[in-house]
Regions:
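N-terminal capping segment at the start of a domain
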Residues: 1-24, 320, 377-381
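Catalytic-core environment of secreted peptidases
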Residues: 60-116
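Alpha-helical metal-binding/catalytic segments enriched in His/Glu/Asp
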Residues: 71, 100-152, 215-221, 231-252, ...
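A non-catalytic alpha/beta surface segment that caps or lines the substrate-entry region
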Residues: 19-66
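Acidic/histidine-rich catalytic neighborhood of metal-dependent amide-processing enzymes
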Residues: 111-212, 260, 271-272, 283, ...
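Metal-dependent amide/peptide-bond hydrolase catalytic core
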Residues: 173, 238-407
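Short beta-strand segments
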Residues: 72-74, 144-146, 195-199, 220-222, ...
């Protein structure tokens, strides 16, 4: 692994503006770099569904020994991301364990840095390039770079179920009788390709063992309009119904793995009119299906009871944004990650996340997907930074993961 090169590559990517729906320049840069490493590069047709100016990037590199491994990160960033000026500086860093001086990459302060997720892409590229340059044995390698991840995982959701199947016209060390979908060639249907999503906080060696189901609530409450000063008795306030429902809903942290929130209420037309309609939006999450469905039912019941009691009606709609992904300590993929971390001297930390990532969607499409911490800190803010050693260690980790699957 070339520590200077991974930093240079990251700084180059940071300078490319790539907000959601406008990832084409970043995708073109990545396609060129992957082609230089020997990958066959293609883009899917997801842009028609996502509205992005490019599709998801899918690249394959034939291996020298049987087996297959895949890595994923996302091309898009949140805003503000126009004219990012990356700064490398030394600062005092304190965490739960130590206080130390560390070299970091941060933005000049007016924008995000975009370590989320360009640090993930840079680490994947450097890890793979190091394997290729060293002539080390390697399994077949797939790289997936998604669009619109920051927009409720639109890019990965639009990925066809068979999009990562190894191309029939491309040689593969693991060529065999593969099942359809995201399975590695030569794998039995019960053996989907291990896919590592580099897109979480936490130092390299952090393994996201679980990420929740995510359901979104949209409700429309109907009351009856009336003049608020002349005949309020004739009206039924839709906003009052919404308030009564929210007041009785279990919200916040429900248990150690379940949360719920109402984040948007809108209704009414004027202060002197009893509001005839109101719209409400919320969500619930849990690692476990029975608990998230119970929470969903409780929120629905609160809305229906309030509407009935106060003389209105309500229409409730729930949408599953993505399913949960849960790994156990004894899973093979976790064992391989722990062995790879040990090989490059990284401490392992098992973490459960309250948010989703592309791994949630890709697991539902048949991959054995798991999210890894890459060291990004304060992401989605102008205070975002990443320690240079974390960027370099993540590239080493990618290299070690590839070696682990070449055994």
């Amino acid at each position: 692994m070339n520590p200077d090169r991974v930093l240079e590559s990251f700084l180059e990517m940071v300078a490319i503006e790539s907000p959601s729906w406008h990832e084409a320049p970043m995708a073109a840069c990545c396609a060129e770099k992957l082609a230089e490493m020997g990958f066959t590069v293609a883009f899917d047709a997801s842009a028609a569904e996502t509205g992005s100016d490019t599709g998801n990037l899918i690249a394959h590199l034939p291996g020298t020994v049987p087996g297959r491994v895949a890595f994923s990160a996302h091309l898009d960033t949140v805003k503000p991301c126009a004219g990012i000026e990356a700064v490398v500086e030394t600062r005092h860093i304190c965490d739960d364990v130590t206080c130390r001086m560390a070299e970091v990459v941060c933005s000049a302060g007016d924008t995000i840095l975009s370590a989320d997720d360009k640090a993930g892409i840079a680490a994947i590229f450097e890890g793979v390039r190091s394997v290729v340059e060293s002539d080390a044995v390697r399994p077949d390698i797939t790289v997936l770079l998604t669009t619109c991840e920051e927009q409720s995982l639109l890019g990965s959701s639009a990925l066809a179920d068979d999009a990562l199947a190894w191309p029939a016209d491309l040689p593969a060390a693991s060529r065999g009788t593969a099942a359809e979908g995201l399975l590695g060639d030569g794998a039995a249907p019960s053996e989907p390709v291990p896919l590592f999503v580099l897109d979480a906080d936490g130092a390299p060696g952090t393994i996201i063992m679980g990420a929740p189901y995510h359901w979104t609530l949209r409700a429309r409450i109907e009351g009856r309009a009336a003049h608020a000063g002349v005949e309020p008795e004739e009206g039924v306030s839709a906003i009052q119904i919404a308030a009564a429902a929210v007041a009785t809903m279990p919200l916040g942290r429900i248990d150690e793995c379940t949360t719920a929130n109402v984040g948007h209420i809108e209704g009414g037309v004027a202060v002197n009119i009893v509001p005839a309609a109101c719209e409400l939006e919320g969500e619930c999450r849990s690692l476990y299906e029975d608990r998230v469905l119970a929470q969903r039912d409780a929120m629905t019941a609160a809305l229906e009871e309030a509407a009935e009691r106060l003389g209105g009606t309500v229409e409730v709609a729930w949408e599953l944004d993505y399913p949960a992904v849960v790994h156990e300590a004894g899973d093979a993929i976790v064992g391989h990650l722990e062995a790879a971390a040990a090989a490059c001297g990284l401490p392992v930390c098992h973490v459960v996340s309250g948010g989703g990532a592309d791994a949630n969607v890709l697991s539902a499409k048949g991959a054995d997907a798991i999210t890894l911490g890459i060291g990004m800190t304060n992401f989605h803010s102008t205070d975002e930074y990443i320690e240079v050693t974390d960027l370099q260690n993540m590239a080493r980790y990618v290299e070690a993961i590839i070696a682990e699957y070449a055994c």
